[in-house]
Amino acid sequence: MTSEQALLVLGIETTCDETAAAVVERRADGSGRLLSNIVRSQTDEHAPFGGVVPEIAARAHVDVLDGIIAAAMNEAGVAFASLSGVAAAAGPGLIGGVIVGLTTAKAIALVHGTPLIAVNHLEAHALTPRLTDSVEFPYCLFLASGGHTQIVAVLGVGNYVRLGTTVDDAIGEAFDKIAKMLGLPYPGGPQVERAAEAGDPNRFAFPRPMLGRQDANFSLSGLKTAVRNEAGKLTPLDPQDINDLCAGFQAAVLESVADRLGAGLRLFKERFGPPKALVAAGGAAANQAIRRMLREVAAKVQTTLIVPPPALCTDNGAMIAWAGAERLALGLTDTMDTAPRARWLLDANATAPAKFANTRAGF
């Protein structure tokens, strides 16, 4: 299989609380075309618990995945026999869901004699902008997906160098925890963003974590604690209190992330030269305030900003299919004994930053 061939790939995503399948075409020139993208969210199943329950998530994937795949194939107008490959997210993620998706992909591949591609969920986010915008390597990636917040130099398919990472909470986690703390509905991230629009970001003097450091790492646990402390002083909270707390929290996150991205882009330029673009991927990139901040950061360093459409920032099958197609074009396929993985580094040689060896920063 070579990059001179057009490739049709089915992608399956089940790492968390979205059941998704999609079909993409990778043309001979390396450009992409999305033929279908079906996503079924489990929000209603998890809302009563205020967060994702792994057992419920896995069972929901089992219940609906076959139908989601059938819908994706039907919308694309593609038969299984026409596929060049079938890709599934093999991690990182909730292991029950990962098993469901990967096992289903193996069955399809086995029955139809189709190559299997086991995709790293984070790599799929990292490569999505090449589907939507045909961006060339190397580019600087701001990845904010689930429990991950990282700045990564994307040098090629399978070639990633981490420039910065969170040493505690990821951005998405912090938004969700603040929402739960303030009694906002699940999923919390969009609720905090919505409340912040009606709030005063200057009412509370929240800290701006890691500001001015030479490294490009993130930390949000102290900010989260500061919000909790201020909320505790105001009990019971009225709606405007909640709006102002969310606005202050989001403003602090934006300033901190902008500073950390500035450091990351400087490190990128020192090691690899100017990036072809600043790229954002992952669910947090769907936040409109974060998108505005990213535009300002990109303008400041005079680089192009690429952010996929919101539907391709959150978890979806298209990104898995595309990553599978990119790998397949290089002849990278997997065997039937490929194991699902709850943890899977995007950059295999990464080590925790100095002084943070005992934190999650190495993951």
Swiss-Prot record:
Top-rank EC class of the record's enzyme: transferase
One function term, GO molecular function aspect: N(6)-L-threonylcarbamoyladenine synthase activity
Positions that bind Fe cation: H121, H125, D315
GO CC terms, sorted: cytoplasm
Cofactor entry: Fe(2+)
InterPro entries to which the protein is assigned, alphabetical: ATPase_NBD, Gcp-like_dom, KAE1/TsaD, Peptidase_M22_CS, TsaD
Protein name (database record): tRNA N6-adenosine threonylcarbamoyltransferase
Organism: Rhodopseudomonas palustris (strain ATCC BAA-98 / CGA009)
Gene name tied to this protein: tsaD
